[in-house]
């Protein structure tokens, strides 16, 4: 394996697993600090780590604490991220600033991918991907998740693109960036809260072994960049697309009226949707992260077996 970058701090559990070639699954921390309310966020983070361990892999939640990129966190670290309102939301552009200032930062999908790759981790589980925002033709608002997927060798397991975004344009950008987009067990690309999006899946896989084979083939060919694995939310937990669509439109209108934009947009929208749905969207969010954690652990095991 490639030695982790010297500026990273790994827990003993993660370091031992990477040294031994055991399966490791990276987890982001923005979902803890900015994606869910306290205390559900810390409970979810702890539960997801437990799911990954029970499935035979080692979880590595990633964040920046006191300016040090951390690969794997303690229970106290998770509590800090979940409850401290001063924790910054950190994408790739922000990493140098937060590290230099020795601040705390919760990593987005993009920053988590970059730090996972520096640690030698190839599988990463999250809730939903960032992408092209609605109205991007005027705002040019696109998530750095996309450019990171185009350049960083990590497979990202999610429930699809966050449904507050323009899913069709996001799929177009992923195609342009040369990123394989695999829908797990479905011919349709999922849309986070819903199993359907109205967009056909670019590619379909039906097992963790298939995903691992695609990962190995891509990187063995020397093709840089990530792999998107879109795992539809369990049917019993989904909010139907036609139902969530109107709720998202209301949340978008509320955001526009408040003049919220940039990296504050997604946290506001997710929080507003929780309010409008009376908590149903939060329940769905937790359910899909659980499902993604199980699948991610299986993929990590299969990929470790190929190495």
From Swiss-Prot:
Transmembrane annotation, as ranges: none
InterPro entries: Indigdn_synthA-like, PsuG
Cofactor(s), by name: Mn(2+)
EC number: 4.2.1.70
Keywords noted in UniProt: Glycosidase, Hydrolase, Lyase, Manganese, Metal-binding
GO-annotated biological processes: nucleobase catabolic process
SUPFAM superfamilies from the UniProt entry: Indigoidine synthase A-like
One Pfam family in the UniProt entry: Indigoidine_A
GO molecular function: hydrolase activity, acting on glycosyl bonds; metal ion binding; pseudouridylate synthase activity
Cofactor note text: Binds 1 Mn(2+) ion per subunit.
GO cellular component, one term: cytoplasm
Reaction catalysis annotation: D-ribose 5-phosphate + uracil = psi-UMP + H2O
HAMAP family documented for this protein: PsiMP_glycosidase
Protein name per the record: Pseudouridine-5'-phosphate glycosidase
Originating species: Nocardioides sp. (strain ATCC BAA-499 / JS614)
